[in-house]
Amino acid sequence: MEKTQKEVTELSSKQRAYLRGRANEEPVVLHIGKEGIVPNLIKQGWDALEARELIKVQLMKGAPYESAREACGVLCEKLHALPVQCIGKRFVIYRRARKDAKIELP
């Protein structure tokens, strides 16, 4: 019997902790610069999430956002992703891949 993939709309604390642990090993994939979140950055983020499911993003100096938390909210909304962690100028987001999901949440 095939397992059906259910769409995750919110992460539990156990799932967030698991993803935070996996994110420690991941390099920064996206950099948000002075232009902010532009269509090209959204495309790169979309492709990265499909390939990796879990990506780390860094807010560069001069970015038009007050905090990484604000940028995380905007990017998550545009990418239909879920925030995992936000520390300093970096944050981690997660979205299950539509095909070939690599990360099994607890």
Feature locations, PLM:
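Positively charged, polar, low-complexity stretches
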Residues: 1-106
